[in-house]
Amino acid sequence: MRDQYQRKIDYVRISITDRCNLRCTYCMPGEEVDFIHHEKLLSTEEILKIVKAFEELGVTKVKITGGEPLVRKDIIELIASIKKMAGIQEVSITTNGVLLEKMIDDLEQAGLDSINISLDTLKPAQYALMTRRNQFDIVMRGIQCAIKSSIPKVKLNCVLIKEINGDEILDLVELAHQTRVHVRFIELMPIGYAKNLTPISEDEVLDLLSKHYEGVKPFEGKLGNGPAHYYEIEGFLGKVGFISAMSHRFCSTCN
């Protein structure tokens, strides 16, 4: 399948719920959130029918997102059923990690290929401030479970905000140094609830990395299906990636 710009479309993202067990300040207004009623959400059968239609159009990779996808009771069934479709090569999810510790075994058995975990800070107090929940320890345990699992790719998504975690960049990068995790920095889009916050650009981060580490160079391989691009650093087990919607336009590479 190709779009009007002749880009090959082989990847689909499906949001299976708007519900979330965190209340991140740049994402939600607070506690009073008007969620979609359950009966108006796509059912298990409807989601699988949609994925099957995309598969027939040439889509080979499926990303399951939310909200928080792990709060749906049918998430394991969905992953396992999609993995059984002959044309689907990869199924991945994006999660905040709160439920990972208790669900990692089921996710492995369902055949999950890749997992993206949102983590914007390594400071428990700052985490509580950003998410309005005290779940830092359980998320960190979930990340360790993912690292130890047989799931092939584990990535951390970090939204950089100058006022909040601008002093933690190197600490977050160290996670890719010591473990197989790929750390991805996502540029904040200062709109909506985040309009008064200050983003940190890819160039600022690269400048910091080049001053602190030797052997920082673009990674020539491919680690995912979206617009992220990666750098490898000498001695690192994981890679450092960027999704730079503000400072580096990536529309031409979107699939």
Where are these regions (language model features)?
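Conserved G/P- and acidic residue-centered "switch" motifs that form tight phosphate/ATP-binding loops
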Residues: 68
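N-terminal [4Fe-4S]-dependent radical SAM core
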Residues: 1-15, 23, 56, 228-239, ...
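Accessory C-terminal segments flanking Radical SAM cores
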Residues: 192-255
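Radical SAM/AdoMet-radical enzyme domain recognition
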Residues: 44-64, 72-182
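Glycine-rich beta-alpha junction loops
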Residues: 160-164, 189-192, 246
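A short acidic, helix-capping loop that chelates divalent metal ions and anchors anionic groups
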Residues: 32-37, 123-130, 191-196
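Canonical Radical SAM [4Fe-4S] cluster-binding loop centered on the CxxxCxxC motif
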Residues: 4-44
